[in-house]
Amino acid sequence: MASFQDRAQHTIAQLDKELSKYPVLNNLERQTSVPKVYVILGLGGIYTFLVFFNIAGQLLVNLAGFILPTYYSLDALFSAGKADDTQWLTYWVVYAFFTVVESAISAPYWFPFYYIFKFALVLWLALPQTNGAQIVFKSLVQPLVGRYFTGGSTSANLRAQADAATKSQ
């Protein structure tokens, strides 16, 4: 069984390999002589510290929920496929839903360390590997507002017919 140090070194090596794909980070490493892995881990640590102690927590978490999803949404709009369009449209609907609920109940006032939990939620919602936005949409948003859209929507009717056809088989 590998020791913790061996596993940490392996993870750092994998992260370094992944970060090597970005020329900006390679240039930064050459200019500063600081390994790009340590720069990213340091910035991530500072970011987490600021969010944890709510030093601009709202701004930092909203940036996390906005910058990367916006990039991927624009990428999806310029791609030929439609699956990624649906994924990011679902993300934005769920993100907007949570933003409205957050404002309505003054969540940061009532929940300690709210922005740490929101950051984890935003990551879970946004990462395609987790399908968080689709899970929340199908289990929470769709039951609440779906009945207002299914009757007149052609895509909803087609979706219902496809679901019925797959269930009958």
From Swiss-Prot:
Alphabetized, the UniProt keywords read:
Endoplasmic reticulum, Golgi apparatus, Membrane, Transmembrane, Transmembrane helix
> Which Pfam families does this chain map to?
TB2_DP1_HVA22 (PF03134)
GO CC annotations on file:
endoplasmic reticulum membrane; Golgi membrane
Domain of life, per UniProt, equals Eukaryota
Which membrane topology describes this protein? Multi-pass membrane protein
Q: Subunit arrangement?
A: Oligomer.
Q: Which PANTHER family match?
A: HVA22-LIKE PROTEINS, RECEPTOR EXPRESSION-ENHANCING PROTEIN
- Family listed: Belongs to the DP1 family.
What the entry says about domains is: The short lumenal loops between transmembrane domains 1 and 2 and between transmembrane domains 3 and 4 may impart a wedge-like configuration, thus deforming membranes.
* Record-given protein name: Protein yop1
- What species is this protein from? Emericella nidulans (strain FGSC A4 / ATCC 38163 / CBS 112.46 / NRRL 194 / M139)
Species classification = Eukaryota, Fungi, Dikarya, Ascomycota, Pezizomycotina
